[in-house]
């Protein structure tokens, strides 16, 4: 029987052939090509992962085979996993990153991308200036890369920094072929604003390590973007606004108290309640949206809640690690008793929970409450959220 842990793991069953070779797919949620290189060396199974669009190649990963031609690939540092079944011509299963789940199939040949018309994408020639820029996060000693657009032949220009949401994002916040930050930058610069958008640290042309970073680190990156705009001769340093999407909205709130002369902040689908509260709502809504219900859903929700409560009540991530082990064992036994999982899966599930939860970014996010900063914001504030948004409902 199959169970979906919306924060943890999926298990699939099937039959198949040899898994060795190069396997290609494209993640629909991010329009992101992905390649697995699976081989056997000195009697050991080895896998490396390419994300060509992100210019990331030969990333190390862990591979596990089990009965029924099941396969699992894990990249623990960035919370990514694939679990499924290998066949003679494909690998089919579930890709997971954080709470995001996607059914995908890998094939032996690269998948030709479908050409989709995007009439909303900006088209040259542009009516504004455009520069590829780099600016320094002095506190963390790293260079961030971005694009700076601004009206031609003007000075004292009001400016906007665009801050992306959670997960590694390029400067356009590109997903499924959509480039919302590019479109926003084009629209705003045509209206007379200077706009800076940048690649997340450790992503595309920005330096740093994304996998080990927390929201606090991303706040420092966004603050560095503001300081860079303040140094530009075209910009009116007293008229700078931070526009953040999702986690970027949370970051904007913090900057609203950290940078005293900030003109304003804009939160697009940002959060206003503590991380564990968001996740309790988010994971249930996501589960219901894909048809999960009944005892499986309730037990999964109870498991998640116990983990998040332990994070809140712990003094540090090391103390939480001790609690996590006992909580996981307790609930895995309950899943086994209800026959939602097989006994042979217990150890792997516990390990997957550990990899998902003992993550500095996740630990900080669960504990952080925007109520710490929101009452202290003194600049202008605009908050926008979609009525059908189940991620930050």
Segments (PLM) and residue ranges:
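Short amphipathic alpha-helix adjacent to the substrate-entry channel of hydrolases
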Residues: 174-195
């Amino acid at each position: 029987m199959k169970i979906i842990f919306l924060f943890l793991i999926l298990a699939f069953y099937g039959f198949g052939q040899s898994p060795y070779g190069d396997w290609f797919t494209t993640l629909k949620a991010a329009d992101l090509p992905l390649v697995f290189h699976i081989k056997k060396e000195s009697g050991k199974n080895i896998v490396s992962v390419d994300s060509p669009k992100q210019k990331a190649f030969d990333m190390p990963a862990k591979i596990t085979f089990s009965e029924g031609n099941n396969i699992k690939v894990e990249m623990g540092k960035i919370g990514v996993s694939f679990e499924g079944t290998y066949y003679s011509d494909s690998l089919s299963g579930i890709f997971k990153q954080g709470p995001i789940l996607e059914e995908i199939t890998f094939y032996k040949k690269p998948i030709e991308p479908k050409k989709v018309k995007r009439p909303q994408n900006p088209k040259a020639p542009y009516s504004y200036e455009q520069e590829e820029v780099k600016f320094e996060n002095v506190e963390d000693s790293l260079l961030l890369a971005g694009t700076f657009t601004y009206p031609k032949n003007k000075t004292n220009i009001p400016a906007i920094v665009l801050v992306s949401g959670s997960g590694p994002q390029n400067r356009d916040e590109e997903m499924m072929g959509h480039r919302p930050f590019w479109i926003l930058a084009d629209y705003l610069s045509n209206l007379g604003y200077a706009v800076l958008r940048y690649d997340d640290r450790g992503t595309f042309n920005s330096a740093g390590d994304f996998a080990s970073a927390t929201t606090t680190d991303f706040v420092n990156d966004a603050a560095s973007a503001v300081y860079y705009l303040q140094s530009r001769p075209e910009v009116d340093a007293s008229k700078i606004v931070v526009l953040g999407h999702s986690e970027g909205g949370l970051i904007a709130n913090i900057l609203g108290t950290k940078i005293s002369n900030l003109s304003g902040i804009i939160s697009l689908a940002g959060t206003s309640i503590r991380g564990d509260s968001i996740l309790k709502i988010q994971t249930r809504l996501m589960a219901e949206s894909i048809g999960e219900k009944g005892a499986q859903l309730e037990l999964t929700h109870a498991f998640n809640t116990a983990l998040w409560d332990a994070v809140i009540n712990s003094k540090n991530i090391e103390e939480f690690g001790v609690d996590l082990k006992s909580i996981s064992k307790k609930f895995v036994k309950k899943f086994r008793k209800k026959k939602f999982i097989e006994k042979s899966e217990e150890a792997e599930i516990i390990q997957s929970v550990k990899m998902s939860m003992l993550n500095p970014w996740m630990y900080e996010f669960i504990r952080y409450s925007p109520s710490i900063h929101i009452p202290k914001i003194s600049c202008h504030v605009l908050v926008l959220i979609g009525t059908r948004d189940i991620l930050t409902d």
